[in-house]
Amino acid sequence: MERGGFGGAGRHDEEAPAMRPAPQQRYRTVESHDRAVVQMAPMEFGSSADASASAGPRYIKPGTNLRTDARMHMASSNGRSSNGSQGDSKLELFGFDSLVNILGLKRMVGEQAQASASTRDGENAGIAIGHPKETETKLDTMMGVFVPCLQNILGIIYYIRFTWIVGMGGVWQSLVLVAFCGSCTFLTTISLSAIATNGAMKGGGPYYLIGRALGPEVGVSIGLCFFLGNAVAGAMYVLGAVETFLDAVPSAEFFQESVTVVTNTFVNGTAAGNATTISTPNLHDLQVYGIIVTILLCFIVFGGVKIINKVAPAFLIPVLFSILCIYIGVFIAPRPNASKWITGLSITTLKDNWSSDYQRTNNAGVPDPNGSIYWDFNALLGLYFPAVTGIMAGSNRSASLKDTQRSIPIGTLHATISTTMMYLLSVFLFGALSTREGLLTDRLLCAAVAWPSPAVVYAGIILSTLGAALQSLTGAPRLLAAIANDDILPVLNYFKAYEGSEPHVATLFTSFICISCVIIGNLDVITPTITMFFLLCYAGVNLSCFLLDLLDAPSWRPRWKLHHWSLSLIGALLCIVIMFMISWTFTVVSLALASLIYYYVSLKGKAGDWGDGFKSAYFQLALRSLRSMGANQVHPKNWYPIPLIFCRPWGKLPEDVPCHPKLADFANCMKKKGRGMSIFVSIIDGDYHESAEDAKTACRQLSAYIDYRRCEGVAEIIVAPSTSIGFRSIVQTMGLGNLKPNIVVMRYPEIWRRENLTQIPSTFVSIINDCITANKAVVIVKGLDEWPNEYQRQYGTIDLYWIVRDGGLMLLLSQLLLTKESFESCKIQVFCIAEEDTEAEELKADVKKFLYDLRMQADVIVVTVKSWEADPDRSGGSKKDDPEVYRSAQSRIRTYISQLKEAAERERRPLMEGGKQVVVDEQKVEKFLYTMLKLNATILRHSRMAVVVLVSLPPPPLNHLAYCYMEYMDLLVENIPRILIVRGYRRDVVTLFT
């Protein structure tokens, strides 16, 4: 018998097991760039401690080449044991090389990073290796999170569209709008803070958080949508800056501006005045200047984080100054030469603007009864929401932050609260400042009211939008590079970036998307698309926090304590509701795009286990289901076969084949429509400490083989002194509760007599007895080499030789075979064995009634024992019907028994086999041989053309020779090409009742 019978790990019993050296403990390789690495001088045997102390530590210079291969580890270990170099260490018992210090913590972190299931739990190992990490300036909370968030939030919408929103929706609905969107971003910020403070965070921002919480498929799909949202948002900001510039400097236009004449501007349902002329920049001017500005911003982004950090204050300070100038102008209005619409802060104006005035507008946003666009609250929601979508700007740069767990919550929350308060205050101020006509027709009302000059606001608008565009063009490439570095989608490999380097290829791709959207040139067409992508990302962050908070796994310990799963759930629902309120069409399109990416990642993506929340949910669901099943017996209606597939207990297969190729096909035949679980087990003979690594390697190989054969199951490899002992451990301990395997499946040992493997009978009988004792059913397959696959359709009959009560297992197996394409054209025949002829008709009627009640269609044939006495029909000319077969079996058994008796007499001990005392009853041996011979002849007579034969397995007689039992089984199965020998257990698996 092979050692373990498992590919690559087995050997023949004739070979003496080679003694292996004791495994040496391995330690982390000391890197040459580790600073302050101390090499303790080895203390020679017999030397004093003082001498060792005088020698002192030797400091290794960085860059010294250190050999750390296995031979060096073995030598160092031997040196410790022989020379006692660590003999005086207080922690020698724990097996550490040196005392616990900060270097030990570095090793712990390094080992966790290497042991992660993904190639990069945030970093791509294949990229980082061989490329020294560049020194990168780390950012604090102010410059790394607060400033980017503020720049993204205070964008074009506030300056150009916010006064118009107040005029269209009225003061009270504008307050509801701002509070509604602010609640969504606030709850998302709470969820973001909780997840970001639950451990170290790598590059990728929200993608990293969602991917590690909801899995790589969801993370990549939402991450790519969020990347597109950032790239398109950059185009929106660029267009806003260009539009403002052309309004402020009309002489810079290359093409003639578009002029819109509105005959009657309707305000509060009445015409407000005469014809109004509205001038808007030409589309081609927007395209030309937009492309130029995008290219200039890309040059800044190519300069890296250092240049961006230097440029960012230059963009933000004028923005804050311009907002201050707007507030000053509001409080001192109206000034001389002010517009006729500006009334100054007035309660009367506030009352007039309190209610909404939704109406039709033209493409320029001017009220027009013949306009093509009708506005309502939902439409305003889609227009305004991009003004609050900058809360992820700081987390997008998580790889560049000094302390992500402190900076992201504080910076993002302060930016969210401050801007929301500013928006709420602005609603009151603008509503009390100007008439509704001015709010709806003057797009740059903020500039008109600003002190001391509109030029301040023009500069603020341009710089704010350029700053927001710069942040978008900075965060989007890093997000795409983080997705590519995770190595989930091979198609994104072009966008990978080395650790510490700039994602130049991703920046070029982002610029291409941004320029493509700039060419569209319509700001109101771009904003709904951005809104959907950002809301999808926010919903993903909230769902991630909801799942992690609800499951409350031991690893869920966020430093940010102000969170609850109900808040995250409300935030996620708010995001979904806002998406459908804005536009169900855009919502369906965005969800369809995310679903397509999810499907593509699941098909083409590389598998990665990031410990996501779904795995924890599956685990807790499995525990709940297991507890709900209890320890009671499973009702026959709920009984599922859980086969324990015993791989390669005997038989020689190629070393690279972990189990018989057809075992997986047979396991699939035992499950209806793939429902159920199979457990593939194998045993490696030997000592556990010596063969543990071999078992792990074999288990991985077997798992891969199961997946290759498309069989739903798990693999288990154990190490035991022998196959019998190993199987006994498996049959007692495998499984949990009612999810324990209930059927043991193995091949019939057809080679035992051919190769004279005399130890197989004892193992075979031991396995069957263990199954009977453990109340497990047994299915032994002969003819596995000829078992059909799913493409080989069979025609004929499935014959059952029902001899003993087995709980209906044989009947159920035959019905399961019929559910497979290979056997669906077959018919079932049930052969019942009767003792007397008088019982035949009664037995046939009972079996037919029983099968009818079981909803099973089968032909019933009764065979009596007396018919065995007649000479068999020899028309087939089979050699099995010749008495020579019977005499050969008798001769082999007599020879074997005589050898056992001679050994017992020679050693003066009782008759023993396999270490157990046995009793030889030659009359029973003759009787059992004859029974098997006649049963085999009956099977050949009636089922010679059967596709599969199922027959009851006789239990091994107590204190009987295993060799004799093996001879009985050989007589039973000989010349039958494909047979299943089935032993049921003391439990019904079929029921008559509904």
UniProtKB/Swiss-Prot annotation:
Compartments where found: Membrane
InterPro entries: AA-permease/SLC12A_dom (IPR004841), SLC12_C (IPR018491), SLC12A_fam (IPR004842)
Residues the record marks as carrying a glycan: 268, 274, 337, 353, 370
Chain ranges on the Cytoplasmic side, renumbered to this chain: 1-139, 196-221, 309-311, 394-412, 470-505, 553-558, 607-994
Topological category with respect to the lipid bilayer: Multi-pass membrane protein
GO cellular component: a single term: membrane
Bilayer-spanning residue ranges: 140-160, 175-195, 222-242, 288-308, 312-332, 373-393, 413-433, 449-469, 506-526, 530-552, 559-579, 586-606
Region feature (Disordered): 1-28
Superkingdom, taxonomy of origin: Eukaryota
Transport listed as a keyword: yes
GO terms (BP aspect): potassium ion transport
GO molecular function: chloride:monoatomic cation symporter activity
Extracellular side: 161-174, 243-287, 333-372, 434-448, 527-529, 580-585
Pfam families linked to this entry: AA_permease, SLC12
Keyword Ion transport: yes
Keywords: Glycoprotein, Ion transport, Membrane, Potassium, Potassium transport, Symport, Transmembrane, Transmembrane helix, Transport
Annotated function: Probable cation/chloride cotransporter.
Family the entry assigns: Belongs to the SLC12A transporter family.
Annotated protein name in UniProt: Cation-chloride cotransporter 2
Provenance organism: Oryza sativa subsp. japonica (Rice)
